[in-house]
């Protein structure tokens, strides 16, 4: 494999001049630049980026943690991150935690051992005191998750307001008994969403029952289970605000299968505005989340920190959400 030394000797220039051409440095004459580029092409020279990054103490790589790549929300988040890192000449490693605390800590070891320049956490499995010691090794950013103790940049959306908006929509449709679904019970983001649900009920002098609240619901099969729990209740909710569109689709599927009319017998709101909302019959009313932009913004902020142009001190960036009204309500 040819080296910079060989290119320099062939062109009768210094190694510094060759390096400047490789790095697109402006202070090289056009004549010398063309000569060096021709030699590089003839010798089929390929720069050793690994060695270069080692000298710079940078990997040009960011890690992204998600619980599962087959969930549509996180697939979109990965898409947003991947597009932006390519545009910025970085690479991304996607790490699945499967909602496991130890797996998340193993991801953070990549930062400690300088295998990545920064980490974007798409979920948060551990308490912050388990995460914060790794900040001395490089930047960490929370995306789609919150923690009150995290003294770093957090990019997400207003979970409280999104839930409040959805529940008020159901109330305005005439519903007085409204259920609620969420996924991880220890997530502060999910807690904020639940608070939005409860505040909407309170503001309209409505009450809820504990059996109308369903936790750890993630996918279509969980939606099946939610419906059957609702069906077996003596005092059923007439509407339900779900944690994501997959759960909403599962509820609707089983409701229709069991002779329920949606929304007449059971109104359903999803969350995320996934494509499944437009495939299911009836189509699903949902909360639209700018997931692609969420990923893009996370990349921009963490690269700013990696480059030394900005710190990731405590700040919360909230992207806008909106209610998309369809047939299920």
Swiss-Prot record:
Residues 4-23 bind DNA. Signal peptide: none annotated. It holds the Pfam family Peripla_BP_3. It comes from the Bacteria. Residues 2-56 form the HTH lacI-type domain. Keywords: Activator, DNA-binding, Repressor, Transcription, Transcription regulation. GO terms for molecular function: DNA-binding transcription factor activity; transcription cis-regulatory region binding. GO terms for biological process: regulation of DNA-templated transcription. The keyword Transmembrane helix does not apply. InterPro entries: HTH_LacI (IPR000843), LacI/GalR-like_sensor (IPR046335), Lambda_DNA-bd_dom_sf (IPR010982), Peripla_BP_I (IPR028082). Positively regulates the ntdABC operon and negatively regulates its own transcription. Binds to NTD to induce ntdABC transcription. This is NTD biosynthesis operon regulator NtdR. It comes from Bacillus subtilis (strain 168).
């Amino acid at each position: 494999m040819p080296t910079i030394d060989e290119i320099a000797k062939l062109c009768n220039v210094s190694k510094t001049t060759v390096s400047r051409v490789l790095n697109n440095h402006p202070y090289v004459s056009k004549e010398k630049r063309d000569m060096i580029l021709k030699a590089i092409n003839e010798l089929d020279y390929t720069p050793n980026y690994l060695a270069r990054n080692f000298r710079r103490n940078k990997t040009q790589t960011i890690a992204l943690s998600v619980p599962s790549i087959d969930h549509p929300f996180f697939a979109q988040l990965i898409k947003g991150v991947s597009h932006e890192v390519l545009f910025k000449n970085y690479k991304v490693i996607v790490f699945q935690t499967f909602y496991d605390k130890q797996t998340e800590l193993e991801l953070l070891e990549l930062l400690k051992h300088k295998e990545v320049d920064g980490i974007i956490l798409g979920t948060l499995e551990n308490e912050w005191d388990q995460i914060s010691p790794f900040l001395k090794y490089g930047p960490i950013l929370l995306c789609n998750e919150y923690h009150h103790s995290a003294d770093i940049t957090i990019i997400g959306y207003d979970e409280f307001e999104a839930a409040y908006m959805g529940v008020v929509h159901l109330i305005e449709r005439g519903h007085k008994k409204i259920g609620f679904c969420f996924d991880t019970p220890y997530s502060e983001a999910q807690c904020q969403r639940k608070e939005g649900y409860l505040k909407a009920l309170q503001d309209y002098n409505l009450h809820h029952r504990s059996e109308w609240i369903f936790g750890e619901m993630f996918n279509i099969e969980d939606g099946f289970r939610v419906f059957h729990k609702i069906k077996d209740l003596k005092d059923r909710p007439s509407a339900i605000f779900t944690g994501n569109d997959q759960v909403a689709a599962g509820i609707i599927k089983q409701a229709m299968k069991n002779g329920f009319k949606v929304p007449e017998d059971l109104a359903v709101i999803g969350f995320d505005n996934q494509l499944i909302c437009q495939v299911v019959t009836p189509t699903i009313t949902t909360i639209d989340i700018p997931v692609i932009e969420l990923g893009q913004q996370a990349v921009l902020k963490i690269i700013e920190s990696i480059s030394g142009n900005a710190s990731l001190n405590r700040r919360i960036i909230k992207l806008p959400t909106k209610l998309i009204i369809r047939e299920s309500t």
